[in-house]
């Protein structure tokens, strides 16, 4: 398997425990915006979507009963992504209990809304994420894309095949997805050196 190109920086995922720590932050604030943010963070990590895809979602793009989200990636290419039950439930609760409090117009189709009842922007979500990263005491370099990197790395570490992860991420070329195999190989190497009696 080919190595990442020279000079190409590797994505920096965070650990599963750090993801959990981050996703737990909005629950500490009992506000409509915090409950929206919880749904967005869960969905981002559940799906591996790009932040631009997340904020572009409309109400009809999420099937919380079936556990799927439909998004449109680069080149307006559609893909259906399964999401875990907790994420589906969190989004369902947001749609039923929180979104009506944020929506000012009945004809607004955007899934995630700001306090003015308009579609939340990438910048708006990024600003909220920075606040949660800070309150969780995590690395300030964490961005929305970090959760996408973490999704891919954790899926491969958990046994997912490269082609499936490629489809979930919406990569046109598998070589783009292969960069994550380097990260999982590095993890295996560190585990080996830490665990093997003759490697210590």
Placement of each model-derived feature along the sequence:
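Conserved catalytic core of the tyrosine transesterase superfamily
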Residues: 1-200
């Amino acid at each position: 398997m080919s190595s990442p190109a020279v000079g190409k920086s590797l994505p920096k995922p965070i650990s599963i425990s750090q993801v959990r720590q981050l996703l737990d932050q909005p629950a500490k604030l009992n506000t409509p915006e915090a409950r929206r943010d919880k749904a967005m963070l869960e969905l981002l990590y559940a799906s591996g979507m790009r932040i631009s895809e997340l904020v572009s979602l409309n109400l009809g793009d999420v099937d919380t009963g079936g556990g799927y989200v439909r998004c449109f990636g680069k080149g307006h290419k559609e893909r259906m992504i399964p999401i875990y039950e907790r994420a589906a439930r969190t989004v369902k609760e947001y749609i039923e209990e929180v979104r009506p409090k944020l929506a000012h117009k009945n004809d607004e189709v955007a899934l995630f809304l700001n306090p003015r009842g308009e579609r939340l922007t990438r910048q708006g979500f990024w600003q909220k994420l920075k606040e949660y990263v800070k309150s969780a005491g995590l690395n300030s370099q964490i961005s929305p894309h970090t959760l996408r990197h973490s999704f891919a790395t954790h899926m491969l570490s958990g046994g997912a095949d490269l082609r499936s992860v490629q489809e979930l991420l919406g990569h046109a070329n598998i070589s783009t997805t292969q960069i994550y195999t380097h990260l999982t190989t590095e993890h295996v190497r560190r585990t080996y050196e830490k665990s093997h009696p003759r490697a210590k």
